[in-house]
């Protein structure tokens, strides 16, 4: 005899399946009592940090005149690459991502120096007083620029199955085309922020909004030239991340920690929205080129597909992001004879990074576009192809 009760009625009494379980911080969120990094009590004499950044995308860094910045009211410390005791790098995989630009600037908004002052507004005003002399160099700003120059942050990758050239040549129908999708800012409500508090024996405690505390710990230790176990990183909660705080937070935590180490005082670096959007990576923009062969029923017989992404000036996570775009390029379709070419383009723009989907949406976009184009050529509904 069949039991007519629903699955929820049949579940054990202690089961959490189907049960209403409130989010751990739900009441704090709706009441406004949830604490984020900027809500934490600041130690007495906390310094506030602002960044001086490159105004152009590519150039030779000649001189940095910081005299007016150092003399500005409230300024306690100014830092450049020369003041880093450890490594000037926060690259998560490839070591090509400097904390401060050194000798060359590679994107508009790249940090060149930092100012620490007794008040955040004093630091920001002082940062604007610096004179940075840069000899401009030609800038590659688009995917097309980078492809023409064969400029890549990582070597191209190629995946082939079957004989796509033969399949395309023998296909009864064939179309080719191009497409592009743009990047996207994460626009988390809580911007990038770090509060570094120096401890005993060169130790450092950092409160920050990050998706990867372990990576921040390693990067700060490398920059300060101390052991990783001397760095504690704490993230109570984030006001949004979406991939934008996976690797990007490390640089700002390192700068706050450098100020704290140099002065022996707590240091907070909190980007305003404009600086955040200018100096942090986005979703990767992609350009596509495809050549597809198919039959009268819309069945794909052969495909040659090129995926080229704008990675920015450094590798960051562009390797795995582009790999995943390749892995998702077939989506749910069978491609018997296919060649996929992935180009990870180096441009003089901010280094793009992780974003929800991590390359998957960009990969699936291409094949869904191709399905739509096949349907249009056959005058059929895409759902019938």
Where on the chain are the PLM-derived regions?
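Flexible, low-hydrophobicity surface segments
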Residues: 1-159, 174-177
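Glycine-rich loop/linker segments at domain edges
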Residues: 19, 25-28, 32, 159-194, ...
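Solvent-exposed alpha-helices and their adjacent loops that cap or buttress functional pockets
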Residues: 22, 41-45, 98-99, 104-109, ...
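Alpha-helical support elements that line or immediately flank enzyme active sites
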Residues: 51-79, 113-133, 194-263, 320-330, ...
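Short, surface-exposed loop/turn segments at secondary-structure boundaries that line and modulate
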Residues: 79-110, 151-152, 215, 233-254, ...
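Beta-strand segments within the central parallel beta-sheet cores of soluble alpha/beta enzyme folds
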Residues: 80-81, 230-236, 264-274, 301-306, ...
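Phosphate/diphosphate-binding loops
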Residues: 111, 117-119, 261-313
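Helix-loop-helix junctions that connect adjacent transmembrane helices in secondary transporters/permeases
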Residues: 145-224, 383
């Amino acid at each position: 005899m069949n039991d007519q009760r629903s699955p929820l009625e049949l579940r054990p009494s202690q089961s959490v399946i189907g049960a209403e379980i409130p989010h751990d911080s739900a009441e704090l969120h709706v009441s406004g009592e949830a604490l984020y990094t900027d809500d934490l009590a600041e130690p007495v004499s906390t310094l506030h940090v602002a960044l001086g950044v490159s105004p152009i995308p590519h150039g030779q860094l000649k001189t940095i005149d910081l005299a007016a910045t150092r003399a500005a009211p409230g300024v306690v410390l100014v830092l450049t690459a020369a003041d880093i005791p450890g490594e000037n790098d926060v690259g998560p995989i490839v070591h090509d991502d400097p904390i401060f630009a050194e000798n060359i600037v590679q994107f508009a908004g790249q940090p060149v120096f930092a100012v620490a002052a007794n008040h955040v507004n004093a630091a920001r005003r002082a940062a604007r007083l610096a004179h940075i002399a840069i000899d401009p160099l030609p800038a590659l700003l688009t995917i097309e620029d980078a492809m023409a120059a064969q400029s890549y942050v990582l070597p191209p990758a190629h995946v082939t199955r079957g004989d796509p050239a033969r399949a395309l040549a023998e296909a009864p129908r064939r179309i080719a085309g191009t497409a592009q999708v743009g990047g996207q800012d994460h626009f988390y409500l809580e911007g990038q922020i770090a509060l570094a508090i120096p401890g005993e024996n060169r130790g450092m405690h950092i409160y920050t909004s990050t998706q990867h505390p372990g990576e921040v710990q390693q990067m700060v230790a490398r920059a300060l030239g101390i052991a990783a176990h001397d760095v504690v990183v704490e993230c109570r909660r984030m006001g949004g991340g979406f991939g934008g705080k996976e690797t990007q937070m490390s640089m700002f935590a390192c700068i706050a920690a450098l100020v704290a180490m140099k002065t022996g005082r707590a240091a907070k670096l909190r980007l305003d929205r404009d600086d955040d959007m200018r100096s942090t990576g986005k979703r990767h923009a992609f350009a596509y080129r495809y050549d597809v062969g198919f039959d009268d029923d819309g069945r794909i017989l052969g495909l040659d597909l090129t995926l080229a992404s704008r990675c920015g000036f450094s590798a960051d996570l562009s390797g795995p992001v582009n790999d995943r775009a390749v892995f998702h390029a077939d989506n749910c379709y069978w491609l018997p004879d296919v060649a996929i070419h992935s180009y990870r383009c180096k441009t003089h723009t901010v280094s793009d990074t992780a974003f929800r989907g991590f390359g998957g949406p960009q990969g699936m976009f291409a094949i869904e576009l191709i399905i739509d184009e096949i349907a249009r050529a056959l005058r059929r509904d895409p759902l019938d192809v």
